[in-house]
Amino acid sequence: MSGRSPLDEIRDAIEGGDHERAVRMTDAILATRPGDDATHELRARALMALGRLGEAERDAKDAVRLDPEEIRYRELLAEVLSREGAHHEAAVEYARLAKNDPRQTTWTIAEARERLGAAEPAMGVEAARRAVQLDPRNGAAQLALAQGLARTGDARGALLAATQAAELLPGDPSAREALADARWLADDDRGAFAEFASLARELDGGDRQRVTAKARALYRGEAGWLGRATAAIGPLFSWALRRGWLQIGS
């Protein structure tokens, strides 16, 4: 006898990437034990990996309902909600976790990020401030604060927090982008553009597109007629930006 339980085998399937098999195994268990919270948790994780988020949410909620005190289940539910784009609901779950353990900065930072995703920047700033108060040297907390303050239009506060985040998270693209955003908000257009251009050369995919769009908007507002003509042609602007051929004045 190996001594391994069916749940151990399901975990192995999930870790090995065989999520369809994990779902089938959990279905078999729940057919005979529908109130097994641990099985609902594993089924939710497998479904989430498969992108079946609606089903994953239902199983995560079942796990929470069956054992409301299990932190792991609430974390899972918050993650599923976030992936579904239900950022307000995810923020509420993270806020509940943080309330039960106020010294845990991870959940408070997660709440702040979800508040931004839910277009609730003021509440995100409040959560981020709590995290910074708990641990001023936490780069993720400073980053969340910088992003929230930028969304609320607080240029000075965003610049201070973003500078801290960039120092605490050296080279981190998100921290560098937050600092560029704060500089733009504080009318340091030249510094913001230079950082956006640098990020555009280093990033790819959607991240590159996002920072390029910011650089393009900034450039269009500062350049002369020739620069505006360049900015009007997206592929040309992106190509010139990545080669360092574009700049703006002070």
State what each model feature region is.
Residues 2-38, 42-49, 79, 83, ...:
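Alpha-helical segment of the N-proximal tetratricopeptide repeat
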Residues 3, 37-38, 71-72, 104-106, ...:
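Helix-start (N-cap) detector for alpha-helical repeat units in TPR-like alpha-solenoids
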Residues 16-24, 50-62, 84-96, 118-130, ...:
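Structural signature of tandem alpha-helical TPR/SEL1-like repeats
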Residues 30, 64, 98-99, 132, ...:
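A conserved position within tetratricopeptide repeats
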Residues 34, 68, 102, 136, ...:
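Short coil turns that delineate tetratricopeptide repeat
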Residues 167-173, 181-209, 216-217:
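TPR/TPR-like (Sel1-like) alpha-helical repeat modules
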Residues 198-201, 207-250:
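Terminal, low-structured helical/coil segments at or just beyond the last alpha-helical repeat
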